[in-house]
Amino acid sequence: MEKVESFKLDHTKVKAPFVRKCSVLDGVKGDKVTKFDLRFLQPNVESFGTAAMHGLEHLLATYLRDTLDGVIDLSPMGCRTGFYLILWGDVDAKTVKIGLEEALKKVLESDKMPAATAIECGNYRDLSLFGAKEYAKDVLDKGFSLNIYGE
């Protein structure tokens, strides 16, 4: 059985926060899709609270579509230390870093949580705008690196 790409990453050596280009996949018709690791918190040291992470997911899923072209999906990591971002095309990590930082600035300006109703969300009661803003501010203050080892 082939090991999942993210399981090959030595989580004890990385230094969050960072933006990591994980892979570029080639479709059968020549299209490309790029997967990114948007790591906000240090693995095995910190983790998001669920309401804050869920809120940040809603906000970033909305704002990243304004700041980056070709967004397919933003998904929370099960370990609750960051998100996976999937984009059409072969996209540069620096472009994603800039778009992510712009989206996080929009999070700080937000006064309403998008898709916060039972119709729009499967767990709408577990959303925290306050918590999402706290994490956004913290990660912007620290700054995202393009070097996963923090050098």
Swiss-Prot record:
Enzyme class: lyase
Binding positions for Fe cation per the UniProt entry: 54, 58, 121
Lineage top rank: taxon: Bacteria
Pfam families, sorted: LuxS
UniProt xrefs under Gene3D superfamilies: S-ribosylhomocysteinase (LuxS) (3.30.1360.80)
Cofactor note: Binds 1 Fe cation per subunit.
Co-factor(s): Fe cation
HAMAP family: LuxS (MF_00091)
Family note: Belongs to the LuxS family.
PANTHER family: S-RIBOSYLHOMOCYSTEINE LYASE
A GO term, aspect molecular function: iron ion binding
Protein's UniProt name: S-ribosylhomocysteine lyase
Stated role: Involved in the synthesis of autoinducer 2 (AI-2) which is secreted by bacteria and is used to communicate both the cell density and the metabolic potential of the environment. The regulation of gene expression in response to changes in cell density is called quorum sensing. Catalyzes the transformation of S-ribosylhomocysteine (RHC) to homocysteine (HC) and 4,5-dihydroxy-2,3-pentadione (DPD).
Keyword Calcium: no
One GO term of the biological process aspect: quorum sensing
Enzyme Commission number: 4.4.1.21
Subunit structure comment from the entry: Homodimer.
Catalytic reactions of this protein: S-(5-deoxy-D-ribos-5-yl)-L-homocysteine = (S)-4,5-dihydroxypentane-2,3-dione + L-homocysteine
Organism ancestry: Bacteria, Bacillati, Bacillota, Clostridia, Peptostreptococcales
Keywords: Autoinducer synthesis, Iron, Lyase, Metal-binding, Quorum sensing
